[in-house]
């Protein structure tokens, strides 16, 4: 990030030799991409071959050599931030733009580049209007003669610096001044011929606070990546069901080992309550998810989703946060929302009988009842014997 420390030099060179650099490169885009530097090299080499010397100011050379490096550095920062944010479901394309820090709340937002304010910084409240450059104005600090420049010279700002970069610090670190305020301070320092103040601000803010910002971003990325594995609703539900089944199984094994009868009322009621709570939670989630967009307004086939996280993505209706839910999560929740199977009571009773046989006292009572005298039992035995005799006789007759 050393090129960021040369921002005051680039701004000053743009003021002094911007028109000359533009005439050499042909366009501002050529300056930003480095084509202007190549054109400068071609002109210099061609003049050397012809034995001539073309006077090119040092300011124009600074613009043609430093701006492409600055653009590459900002693009690298942009790619790093977008790459990290892509892992967690998207990046906000427009961050907060009004975090003045220790500046007055009426700090101007400026142009798209963030360097050209519509009305400047004036603690006395008199205001700074760059349209009227011939009017005498008060300096923002005592002892500083403010000499503003015409509007069109700062209209394009620094090529290659995106808008979100000016507000990135303010979005994640509200207690610090935003990058827009930092660059505004640098610009005011240059306009007031107080170049060293601008260099001091850049050296202090862009070296220390940007490093803090990057550390905070890295921590945020890691925390979000860790939360992805913990916020999976299907995994959470499966874990709860697995824990419930494991607890019930362990309790049943302990009772079997101790020879105690299984109390089916408590596990059944607990299972019913858990199933009811699970069904209600699944129903609420399905109801909420059904009323939310599945595509996130991002013009993709399945949308951008990270297991149902809140994301922000630009689209036809803007970049507001959406909630995207994949279809397979809804399918699993619908299956969980179905009626749970009922416990077969006969199988449970048979299992109880096998585990806990009838006690000896009950066997003795059964034996007494069966040995008690009665006519019905005698007649029943006689009938049984007679039926068997007649049947055997019939069989013999048939054989003869």
Swiss-Prot record:
Chain ranges for the short sequence motif Nuclear localization signal as given in the UniProt record: 359-369
Start-end of Low complexity biased regions: 370-379
Keyword field contains Lipoprotein: yes
Biased segments, Basic residues type: 380-400
GO CC term, one of those recorded: host cell endoplasmic reticulum membrane
Lipidation (N-myristoyl glycine): 2
Superkingdom of this protein's organism: Viruses
Region (Disordered) location: 99-118, 348-400
Keyword vocabulary terms for this entry: Capsid protein, Host endoplasmic reticulum, Host membrane, Host nucleus, Late protein, Lipoprotein, Membrane, Myristate, Viral penetration into host nucleus, Virion, Virus entry into host cell
Region (D1) residue spans: 307-342
GO BP annotations, alphabetical order: symbiont entry into host cell; viral penetration into host nucleus
Region (DNA-binding): 347-394
UniProt family annotation: Belongs to the polyomaviruses capsid protein VP2 family.
Protein name per Swiss-Prot or TrEMBL: Minor capsid protein VP2
